[in-house]
Amino acid sequence: MDFRLEHPRPELVRENWQSLNGVWDFEIDNARVGIWNGYEKRESLSDKINVPFCPESRLSGIGHTDFMYGVWYRRDIEIPAEWQGKRILLHFEACDYFTRVFVNGKLAGSHKGGYTPFSFDITELLSDDGNYITVYAEDDPTGEHQVAGKQSHRFNSYGCYYTRTTGIWQSVWMEAAEPAHIIRYATSSNLAQSNVTFTVDFTEASLGADVIVTALYDGEEVGQIETVVNSRRMTITLPLSELRLWEIGNGRLYDIVFEVIDGEERSDVAKGYFGMREVMLKKDGFYLNGERKFGRFVLDQGFYPDGLYTAPSDEALVADIKASMSFGFNGARLHQKVFERRFLYHADKLGYMVFDETGNWGLNTSDPMNVYNFLPEWIEEIERDMCHPSVIGWCPFNETWDKDGRRQSNELMELVYNTTYAIDASRLIVTNSGSYPCPKNDCHDVHDYEQDPE
């Protein structure tokens, strides 16, 4: 069976990492009593599940499609000897919806949201006598305060609502890093000056350390800069001796190496990539790298018959993109779901444009207070995907038209637009696709399902 063992974060890879996908212990806890009865310290659970596939899917080995309000996972882990002295980071790419993670029965941390990755430094919770992880996820898509996308809020699928996804549905993995290391980066291209600006997040231990950033194209160095880490988040601009543009159908990518040096003996090396391209919207249309382009996009909902939210293999992600391109499309609107990073990685390589959306359905957008349930995860999504050249635009909401006599909250729409623009002004923003005009929007789109081309 394919447990999806490829690296889940190809834009930032360290040498020392380990997939935790595979067979885990599993138990449904609809009464949600396990948290009070010490399930996090149990030596086993009642069933087995194939991670990263959700328990509703056939590939999980469970195939339970009724509502599951609480689910538990457990597995033993082994820390390689060569990781000794490093920080051990535990990563979850996505788990729906409210998740608590325990290591050896002790709480490592929690996360709210079903679509974005989260991580914990578990170094201090590890033991020399063996280690195990326990995960508890609560999920209830039937209310109006939780984003759920097109997961059905009824027992069965109906209309354009499909089988639900509960708990872990993307990869779980560990990596070892030095205390001083890079956490994430975003990129911004300046074609006129032939340079790229990285906005880099560092750990606190990185302050005062040296960082060397090296760009390569086809294995040849085309730029390098060395500086001192003076802030947890800082910008680094790197001039390039060769300018190769990322284009539709030709995803030209540079390799990038970040080396954080803390003293003479300790250095953390992480490798990634970036693309050079600029997007712009003018009165006469959309422009990529200064040339007017027509976006012919497919609506991709990212559901799979056997894996539901989770692609059965990495090859399936590539096949989806290549099929779309073979039909004459040059991009996709990733609809009501946050796709896994490897989809964007393949879109980057193939020159396939993407509008990044989230699964806002399920959230009552007439209530401005729901910003607390939406905005934190939306910011996490933007920060996750800002390094991908294939992502040319953001779409936080879809079709939030009047419902039961309630109007969408313009205060909510305006706040989300302003927040998105403040984080990333380099991409297009369609605040609300196919709905009423918003108080702030880069462009307004219409969903027209007329089948007669005349």
Predicted regions and their residues:
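Accessory carbohydrate-binding/adhesion or oligomerization-edge regions at the termini
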Residues: 1-60, 136, 142-145, 218-220
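Accessory beta-strand-rich segments of carbohydrate-active enzymes
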Residues: 6-11, 15-16, 25-31, 63-181, ...
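Conserved, mostly hydrophobic/aromatic
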Residues: 24, 105, 172, 254, ...
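Extended acidic/polar, glycine-enriched regions
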Residues: 127-130, 201-280
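Surface beta-strand/loop "capping" patches
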Residues: 176-206
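N-terminal carbohydrate-binding accessory modules
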Residues: 185-186, 257-324
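Substrate-binding/catalytic cleft of secreted carbohydrate-active enzymes
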Residues: 319-322, 331-454
